[in-house]
């Protein structure tokens, strides 16, 4: 049996793989705390002001590709997740898959192409650390961004064979960003951060904190 990320929901993942949503996890707490320690430069603040201005002017009519091209992509590029020294990179729509045994001991092939993926590897992804899913509107009629993101995170966790190590994720619905962490069979979702407000600083600091965390994991 097989299931694509686009067909996965939180309910499906909970019922079939025993995943459980909790209020918080050490991985998310540490991520937030590390982000609060980061100070942004004047240049970064100027960049963010430009990105935010474009977002405010266009959020109601941008399609998914335009949102990614003009706002999400530049945000990730400013953090610069390409790191040859620590051997990890940011990839887009690269296929990942694995087989996972469900609660009935049936082997399920989970597969898909996350909108974004940070993993070891330079030319192609190897061991994932972070999965990203983007949705243009707050809620699409088909698909569930949080379910898609979590299913990709579950695949990453299985590939790495380190269930105790936090797997990180993020899904964006329009202007709102949500951060996720999966540890073992427990996962949590942060509050939403509105990129058209001062929350943009929080979002950017979370991305920078993620980079530092991945550098530590790959040292």
Provide a role label for each language-model segment:
Residues 173-175:
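Short loop/turn segments that connect beta-strands within the blades of beta-propeller domains
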Residues 167-171:
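A short beta-strand->alpha-helix segment at the C-terminal rim
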Residues 2, 13, 20-21, 27-32, ...:
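A short, conserved, highly charged catalytic patch centered on acidic carboxylates
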Residues 177-181:
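Short active-site-adjacent structural elements
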